Amino acid sequence: MHITQLVLRHFRCFDVVDFFPLPGLNFFIGENGSGKTSLLEAVHLMGYGRSFRGRVRDGLIRHGSENLEIFVDWQETALINARRRRAGLSHYGQEWIGRLDGQKIMHLASLCAALAVITFESSSYQLINSNAELRRRFLDWGLFHVEPDFLDLWRRYTHVLKQRNSLLKQKEELAMLEAWDQKLSEVGEQLTFRRFQYLERLKQRVIPLISRITPNLKIHGFNFNHGWRRHELPLIDALFISRERDYQYGYTSLGPHRSDWTPQFSSIPGVHFLSRGQGKLITLMCLLAQAQDFFDQRGEWPILALDDLASELDQKHQWRVLEMLAEIPAQVLITGTEIPQGLKPFFSVGAMFHVEHGAITRMF
């Protein structure tokens, strides 16, 4: 899929912008504060239903305005049932209002399912060395887009988990807790299996990508922590064993909501030994592997939004990343404060835009 038109009204530093990106590589150059990141933020907002830079009160609406609007048209590129799509997202007062193909949507998940965006921004490197919740979200995003029933499965697990935690806080009777343990284990085992299988698919894509981009790291796979000792006992038994502790804590201490995964290297002891630049490359390759899996399952590429791609990467690694991006038929939106040397060989296969004072001008 690729965006054919993006309209912003009263979004961040933009008053009104009507922009037409190209299907392939799109480079956006401008000074800090010019609106480059805000442009990708708007695309991200349409694909995730939230910003990666804060909430509405953090300056999402242009100063002096009372509302914001984002409209996006895109072309699906799957071989079967490809069509043109249109979506809009507005914020008035305290409410977000979304529309998809001319119809008002009740939940932003409908919009997120339609427009797939993979975003790399300043905090994305935390994927591999920060808290486990980010890594669970990473897996769940991919499953949400390639397995139609995954959202329902995830919601069922979340609902049952909340019910069990409520019973633990209220010190409810054992019989009632046992019933919810059974439900939690049934859904939890399914959720864990989906995540594990998806991570195994990603491993087959990540290893060759990292070997090509930074071969010295020698990645050999991922370690998946199920959230309990699954190799020793099923979830239903683990919940029974932890029941007394859970009563004491007032919440469920194990299960898929405690799962995690980490890349494994033969060249270094762990991710904490990576430089910031290496961490950025590993994260970026994980995201590209996710994009490849999306293509393999759906028959089209998601939109890639890469903010400040060249920072902390030397010219050699810039070139390798851009060479890889130029080989895939995905729409890629890349920002930077200047034109890095590593990008110049790829201008012939993309377009360059200058962002200044809330305006976007094509350079070539």
Swiss-Prot record:
Record keywords: ATP-binding, Cytoplasm, DNA damage, DNA repair, DNA replication, DNA-binding, Nucleotide-binding, SOS response
InterPro entries found in the cross-reference section: DNA-binding_RecF, DNA-binding_RecF_CS, P-loop_NTPase, RecF/RecN/SMC_N, RecF_2
Compartment(s): Cytoplasm
One GO term (biological process): double-strand break repair
Alphabetical list of Gene3D superfamilies matching this protein: P-loop containing nucleotide triphosphate hydrolases (3.40.50.300), RecF/RecN/SMC, N-terminal domain (1.20.1050.90)
Domain of life, source organism: Bacteria
Principal cellular location given in the protein's record: cytoplasm
Binding of ATP, residues: G30, E31, N32, G33, S34, G35, K36, T37
A GO molecular function held by the record: ATP binding
An example Gene Ontology CC term for this record: cytoplasm
Described function: The RecF protein is involved in DNA metabolism; it is required for DNA replication and normal SOS inducibility. RecF binds preferentially to single-stranded, linear DNA. It also seems to bind ATP.
Protein's recorded name: DNA replication and repair protein RecF
Family to which this protein belongs: Belongs to the RecF family.
Annotated source species: Xylella fastidiosa (strain Temecula1 / ATCC 700964)
